[in-house]
Regions:
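Edge beta-strand at a domain terminus
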Residues: 39, 164-166, 170-189
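Short, solvent-exposed loop/hinge segments that bridge or flank secondary-structure elements
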Residues: 40-41, 58-90, 97, 178
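Hydrophobic/aromatic beta-strand elements that line small-molecule binding cavities or substrate pockets
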Residues: 77-82, 102-106, 127-132, 152-159, ...
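Helix-adjacent hinge/juxtasegments
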Residues: 97-126
Length: 189
């Protein structure tokens, strides 16, 4: 009887070990990807990413109907970007109709992410954190809600070439309702 108990325990343990092994094999690619995304960028690598925005751009934006936009609206504007402060920060000036905004982007070595501050001519400002995806040549920004209203936001910038950026902006309230949707195309001039 004791021998049978050991055999059953061994078989059960073996199945558990196999299940754990299969689970580990399935989880490794996810952990590996997370590790790669969390790797530190060198100062030169961060500089190379920041220079992708540098220069003068013309933009065409489509604001889709949402809570913050009563109807679909198309706008045009221009953007001028320059590296500042020993090439550690990117200063972006956005001119769109009567609105002007200044964005500051930098790479934070401590958090292994990019930081983005946006200051608008109406006095409002926003803060975003970003991760660079080298494979897709895209930057994904996540909105940080200091107001605690439960607003979430994402900006996905896809660098289609050295001369074109396609951007999608989505902001939602805590229930998931769309507050803002923007599709933007920027072309270097």
């Amino acid at each position: 009887m004791i021998l049978l108990s050991f055999i059953i325990l061994f078989i059960f343990e073996k199945k558990t070990v196999m299940k754990k092994l299969i689970l580990i094999i399935m989880i490794m690619p996810v952990l590996g990807t997370s590790y790669l995304n969390a790797q530190k960028l060198s100062k030169n690598s961060a500089f190379d990413i920041l220079t992708k925005w540098e220069g003068k751009w013309k933009s065409n934006a489509v604001f889709e109907k949402s809570v913050w936009t009563n109807e679909r609206v198309e706008t045009r504007g221009k953007t001028e970007t320059n590296l500042i402060l020993s090439n550690n920060y990117l200063e972006i000036m956005v001119y769109n109709n009567d609105n002007t905004s200044k964005h500051i982007i930098c790479y934070d070595q401590m958090s292994n992410q990019f930081n983005r501050w946006e200051f608008k001519s109406d006095g409002t400002n926003t803060f975003w954190t970003g991760k660079w995806n080298k494979t897709d040549k895209s930057m994904t920004w996540n909105y940080i809600d200091f107001s605690n209203y439960g607003i979430s936001g994402k900006i996905i910038e896809n660098f289609k070439s050295d001369d074109m950026i396609k951007t999608r902006v989505i902001m939602k309230d805590k229930s998931g309702k769309s507050l803002l949707k923007i599709n933007l195309t920027q072309e270097k001039t």
